[in-house]
Amino acid sequence: MFLSASMASSSLHVAIFSLIFLFSLAAANEVTVGGKSGDWKIPPSSSYSFTEWAQKARFKVGDFIVFRYESGKDSVLEVTKEAYNSCNTTNPLANYTDGETKVKLDRSGPFYFISGANGHCEKGQKLSLVVISPRHSVISPAPSPVEFEDGPALAPAPISGSVRLGGCYVVLGLVLGLCAWF
């Protein structure tokens, strides 16, 4: 059976769109510190905290965090928890000074950042964030009931990333199969 040129073109477009969609699901996110305002600077008030802002976001392994600041006047230091808590700028794990720093979050667990400018960390220019493990599901299981008669019920197992990715391959297979059919 021969395909007309327009049907073949339509099938190709569907296949390409499907591939783009699948790759977008696996793409890493870039998150700018501070959200839309995007400025790495001393917070405007003592009630604002970069860490509280970060707690509203979900960071996963492979994401990037972007710091925007005036090069030459400020910097970003990646530090240990102890250095973060004491605003100690000596011996950072990493020192960034380019004005638009993009840090890859390459592991799960906590990350700590402080300003390298004198006195800025003490005025609140610091950020701690937690990167979730690839094992964690984006969807949290429902809470268990408070009272039990026969014993506690098990929470449903979280859906792993490999199961979600496997579902994407099924969709891709269906689309490609439909393309071959027409």
From Swiss-Prot:
Q: Which gene encodes it?
A: ENODL14
**Pro-sequence positions in this chain?**
161-182
User: Chief localization class?
Assistant: membrane
Q: What does this protein do?
A: May act as a carbohydrate transporter. Required, together with ENODL11, ENODL12, ENODL13, ENODL14 and ENODL15, for male-female communication and pollen tube reception and burst at the synergid cell surface of the female gametophyte.
UniProt membrane topology term: Lipid-anchor; GPI-anchor
Has keyword Disulfide bond?
yes
Keyword terms of this UniProt record: Cell membrane, Disulfide bond, Glycoprotein, GPI-anchor, Lipoprotein, Membrane, Signal
Compartmental location: Cell membrane
Q: Looking at the Swiss-Prot or TrEMBL record, what is one Pfam family this protein matches?
A: Cu_bind_like
- Report, as the record phrases it, the tissue specificity of this protein: Mostly expressed in seedlings and flowers, and, to a lower extent, in roots, stems and seeds, but barely in leaves.
What is the name attached to this protein's record? Early nodulin-like protein 14
Signal peptide coordinates? 1-28
What are its GO cellular component terms? plasma membrane; plasmodesma; secretory vesicle; side of membrane; vacuole
Q: Where is the organism placed in the taxonomic lineage, from the top?
A: Eukaryota, Viridiplantae, Streptophyta, Embryophyta, Tracheophyta
Subunit-level organization: Interacts strongly and specifically with the extracellular domain of FERONIA at the synergid cell surface.
Among PROSITE patterns, the record links this protein to:
PHYTOCYANIN (PS51485)
- Disulfide cysteine pairs (residue numbers): 87-121
Superkingdom of this protein's organism? Eukaryota
Q: Which residues are glycosylated?
A: 88, 95
Q: Which GO terms describe its molecular function?
A: electron transfer activity
CDD domains per record: OsENODL1_like
Which PANTHER family does the annotation name? BLUE COPPER PROTEIN (PTHR33021), EARLY NODULIN-LIKE PROTEIN 14 (PTHR33021:SF420)
